[in-house]
Each structure stands twice: as C-alpha cells, then as structure tokens.
Amino acid sequence: MKHHLDHDWQGNMASPRKNLGEKTKLHFFFILSFVWIFTGLIGHEPWRPLESASISQILEIIQNNQFIHPASASNDVPYYPPLYAFFGASFAKLLSPFLEIHDAARISNAMWISLTMLSIGLLTRELWGIGFGRSAGLFFIASIGLIVNIHTLTPEVAALFGFGLSLYAFSLYFRRPFRSSVILGIGLSVLFLSNGIIPFLSIFITAFFLGFFSFWKNKRYAIFLAISLLVNLSIIGPWLFLFNISDPSLFQLWINQPILNSTPNFWYNLQGIAWFSWPAFPLACLLYTSPSPRDS
C-alpha cells in the first residue's frame, strides 16, 4: 500500500529570506549616524592648534558680546566670519550648566553634520530616487578624513552644510526652480558667513560654468542665479553693513586680506582631497558609470 506524503522540504530547508523593512533600515541608519556623530565629540580638552582660533572667537562672543567681528586671540583681524562661532557660543551658553564651554560648543557640530547629512540625502534622493539617500549618508560617514574633523571646533564643519545645500539646490533646479534658487542662496550664505570667500567662490564659479552647457543655457537658469544672488545678498548684506559701521578700519583690513595662500601646495591639497574623500570618491566614480535608476 503506497502512501503519498506532501512535504515542502525545499521551503523548510531553504535559507530564510532577508526581509528588513524600509523603516527598520532607516532606524539602523539613524542609530549608526548618532553613534558616529557623538562618539568622541565631548569629554576631551581642546585640540591645539586646531581649535584655538574657534574657541577664542566663541569666548569673545560669550565674554564681550562681540557678535559682529569676534577675533581670535592670535589674530586681531577675524579670519573667519562669525556664523560658526555664533552657534558654538549659543550652544555653550545653553549647555554651560552641564558641560565645559568647549564641550558644549562642540555639540553645535552635531547640528551642522546632521543638516549636512540631510542635504546629502535629499540631493541623492532627487537624483537617484527614494531609498538612495541612506546609501549616500553611509558613504559620507565612511569617509576617513571626517572621523576626527567632525569632532573639531572648526568652521569647515559648517561649510560642509553650505556645500551640501548648494549641491541639493542644483539637483532640484529642473523640478522646482524657484525653491532651488532660494536654497542655493541660503547655501551660499552659509558658506560665506562660516568660511569666507573661497568656498563661496567655488560654488559661484561652478554655477557660472554650468551656464555653458545646453541643459542650463537658458533664460530660466539666469533667473535662477539672479534670485539666488538676491537671497544671498539679503542674508550676508546686513552682516557686512554692520561690520563696516562698527569698525571701518578693521573692515578694510578684513576686506584686503589675501584670498589665496601665497605658497599653495598642490600635491598637499590633492593628498588632502584623497584622504577626505576615501572611499566615497571611488564609489561615486563607479556609480557615475552606472545608469541612474531614474533612467531605467
């Protein structure tokens, strides 16, 4: 007598499928980012000479209420505009009952880096679609050169957000031209008010040369740039005006500072770029040669 037994042996013995939902992946990414940002951010003395200038500016704001042109102890002329120092001083005042001034000021880095990662995620989502923002964020936090520097009191941390916001504006231009022009104006303002003219010029020159390409060579792009500059001037203009009114001689000294280093070291800068962009840059080159999911 034959017996026929139906048994799904393939289904029972097969490896279980990975079934992590989008929310779970997002939660893992948030936890990883939180650990990456806050590990090593506080609990140590100021690093010298990396943090000396920023701490001097922050103390100048806290102790002397000098919000317009706080100068560092080693330099009478403010090397950087006051945006980064202002937020550092604000966090220091807010958290001073619980943390040392330098530790409390470093908490502002968490704000800048979070905003940077948000802008990178929005940029990648705009170019590649939903779900790719996390990947870009992982590439960003994997960059070796950022590990120490995001925990350092330096205005370049705020400039990262300005760059991310400006690049997001370019990616948004074709879908939302007016909104992207406002975002670009804000990004340029963050760059100028945190790190000075060089980062501002890098984005401005990029925007100028984009106008020579067929996709950007039109009247709408000219209006986009005009609105961006108008927004930018409306933000940085009041600070420049107040700086000139409060101390005209110091303002002239600041304006007449050399823009570029008199002895630039090309290979040193190239090594720095390679260090800070590893492994994000090789991965970006690999993705550039691959078709975008939006094109499929």
Regions found by a protein language model. Give the residues of each.
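Transmembrane-helix motifs of polytopic, lipid-linked glycan transferases
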Residues: 107-127, 165, 288
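Membrane-interface transmembrane helices that cradle and orient dolichyl/undecaprenyl
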Residues: 125-131, 166-183, 190-191
